[in-house]
Amino acid sequence: MLKPPSPQPPLLPGQVDFANILFAGPCNRFCPFCIGQRLPTRVNVNNLDLFPPRNLDALIDEVNRLGIRHIVFTGTITDPQLYRHEARLLDLFRARVITSAQYSVHTNGVLALNKLSVFNRYDKACISFPSFNPITYEKMMGARRVPDLEAIVARSNIPVKVSCLVNEHNVAEIDGFLQRCRQIGVTRLVLRKLYGETRDWPILRSTPVKAYYRNNPVYDFDGLEVTYWNFDLTTSTSLNLFPDGTLGTSYLLVETPELQAQSALYRTAMQNPA
């Protein structure tokens, strides 16, 4: 007889930095380093046309119980702006979440200008953008057309942060990339190492550290705030609603204990059929 997985200890108010609502389905980019591809296939159920998303009530109940003040629309294997009910879901959250939460979208920016009215309904945005160079961009995002980041920043009514994955394809461009971002009006930027990356990239070495956030150094690059993010060292915490309705409690999606417990149960069931 199968035993249910041991329950995770309940989270307490003040322990969680933010909540993610995660979308899955066909994407408009084909990133070779997409972390969502490392999740169990059963998790990435297409929910781009589903309203409300699976198990949303449980997420909202936990957001209210824990007093979470930051809610992020993002994806496992797709872009959240491909979700068909984006504005409607924002309205639902704002009606039912009792904390004075801020809402943000973590997007590749491909649809930002076409959906500008919805984009501007968030409180802030983070755009995954690794390079202005189409050749480099294609290596890292799977498509050559580079979104017009300058136009997005200029036309947005909300703060726009840039998230730039760093690897062998763009590391030589980073200084120029930071300068260009600063010139077009970006004020905050995060450089991210791949999860599990052990190489130490030669960047920001002459720039003094001004602070640390969740164990990640923060720099002042001529007025541009730059955080160098290491997924393996960060102390960030999050609550995550996966596309299949699983509510996970690990900031690192691939280490979600709730998913690991489900996988263990499934393997046991396959090894011991009734």
Language-model segments: residues:
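Core AdoMet radical
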Residues: 18, 38-53, 66-83, 94-112, ...
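Radical SAM enzyme [4Fe-4S]-AdoMet core and its adjacent flexible, acidic
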Residues: 46, 135-150, 154-244, 248, ...
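Aromatic/hydrophobic pocket-lining residues that form the small-molecule binding cavity
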Residues: 52, 56, 86-89, 145-149, ...
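Acidic (Asp/Glu)-rich catalytic clusters
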Residues: 62-65, 116-122, 150-156
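Distinct, well-ordered alpha-helical segments
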Residues: 84-91, 112-120, 172-180
